[in-house]
Amino acid sequence: MVSLTTIEQSPVKCETTTEKESNDTRGTDSNENAETKETKKGFPFHDLAKLQKQYKNKSSRNESLVALIYLLGSMLSFCLLIFFTDFYLIPLFPTTTTMTDYIVFNFYLLNVFVFCMVHFIYHFVKNISLQQHLEHWQKFSYLSNINLLISSQITILYYLFYDYVFFFKIFTLLMNFIGLVAYFFILTDKLISSKRFNKTVFFISVSVVCCSLPLLTAIITFDGLENLKERIKVNAITWELVALVAASIIYVTRFPESLFRRNKKEEGWNHSEYLFHLLISGTAFYHFFILIQSYILMHSSLNQPELINFKS
């Protein structure tokens, strides 16, 4: 009897187990189908979740701080681009402010905004280690450096030679030619593959050529530095050059971690990467302050340009 009951019950158990297995397989298939449907429907959100996870795993504090610096710089330059000329520049000298002043300030602020935004995107991409896009954004960051350098020189040239149109045209064409040569070295990958020292020498040499030729011409034309000080703030430009040289030294020597033999991967506000970009972004806005001072000097002097005025 015992054996018969066991034999009779065994098919029932087999049927129940097969039913459970079939239900389990159906459940897993339905779950997989539901997951695939959800991923197909919300594909961008799925990518965003992966991006957030990748950012948490690979982000560094230094790159986050640098990206934050340029994000704040882009926001500030955008606000200045929208409001500064209309609410401060024109009311300061309403009868003598020209359309050229308006264009000069907005042209420089636009380049500062592009510079900060491109560097923000580059360091954000670098922070999450998207290697397939990193090289392209590195090129864009170098191009934005050249754009900012050339625009800063052209804008200060206007206030240096506002009554010498020939010199302004010649040096503006020269700055554009130097910028095109720099573009060639950047776009042909000759600069990206070079070392940190060679990159620094490249940018310093471009800066020296762009600054020295107009200043020497102005000193000869205006009979010394005293007359030159009536047009631009020479002391402020000197401090700007000192800041750029200090940033270059920090970039090459990796100061201060190299001096104190600290771990190069150690992160903090006093890391060389953070200090370098803080100085570079700070000099961009400091040059904007120099332009304001030069604008005040020009419109406060007797030699005011007779161009299109906003108020007659």
Swiss-Prot record:
The chain crosses the membrane at residues 65-85, 102-122, 142-162, 166-186, 202-222, 232-252, 278-298. GO terms for molecular function: signaling receptor activity. Pfam families: HlyIII. It comes from Saccharomyces cerevisiae (strain ATCC 204508 / S288c) (Baker's yeast). Its main location: endoplasmic reticulum. This is ADIPOR-like receptor IZH4. One of its GO terms (biological process) is intracellular zinc ion homeostasis. InterPro entries: AdipoR/HlyIII-related. It is found in: Endoplasmic reticulum membrane. It comes from the Eukaryota. It is a multi-pass membrane protein. The gene is IZH4. One of its GO terms (cellular component) is cytoplasm. Residues 86-101, 163-165, 223-231, 299-312 are lumenal. Induction: By excess zinc. Residues 16-38 have a biased composition (Basic and acidic residues). Residues 1-38 are annotated as: Disordered. ADIPOR-like receptor involved in zinc metabolism either by altering membrane sterol content or by directly altering cellular zinc levels. Belongs to the ADIPOR family.
